[in-house]
């Protein structure tokens, strides 16, 4: 997808840069970062990240800096208007989701409720 098109989910430059480094480390240019939502965590839903070399029917793909973020349709409905970012700080480094649909989140930020 083009950067000029309004996307339902943003893939930040910092996240794309880190994905690019991690894919290079794996020596598999077919890998994409997949973000998904599952039931669980202390707030009802939790975010998950994995590297995947497949794009399934219905998946949305966002490309930036030559790498791709992939989201399945079920997860996307909970992520519309959000952003996938990468942060480094005192708590360590990690991919994070900023989600305007979340009514509450847990302290670690990986679990939320709607």
UniProtKB/Swiss-Prot annotation:
Cofactor: binding details: Binds 1 iron-sulfur cluster per subunit.
Binding sites annotated in the UniProt record for iron-sulfur cluster: 42, 106, 108
Gene3D superfamilies tied to this protein: HesB-like domain (2.60.300.12)
Annotated organism of origin: Enterobacter sp. (strain 638)
Gene: erpA
UniProt keyword list: Iron, Iron-sulfur, Metal-binding
Protein's name according to its UniProt entry: Iron-sulfur cluster insertion protein ErpA
Function field: Required for insertion of 4Fe-4S clusters for at least IspG.
Protein's UniProt keywords contain Iron: yes
């Amino acid at each position: 997808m083009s950067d000029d098109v309004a996307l339902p989910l943003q893939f930040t430059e910092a996240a794309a840069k880190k994905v690019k480094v991690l894919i290079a480390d794996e020596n598999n240019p077919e890998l994409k970062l997949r973000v998904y939502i599952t039931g669980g965590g202390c707030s009802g839903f939790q975010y998950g990240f994995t590297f995947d070399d497949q794009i399934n029917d219905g998946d949305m793909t966002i490309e930036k800096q030559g790498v791709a973020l992939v989201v399945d349709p079920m997860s996307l409905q909970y992520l519309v208007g959000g952003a996938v970012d990468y942060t480094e700080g005192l708590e360590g480094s990690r991919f994070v989701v900023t989600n305007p649909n979340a009514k509450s989140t847990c302290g670690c930020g990986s679990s939320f409720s709607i």
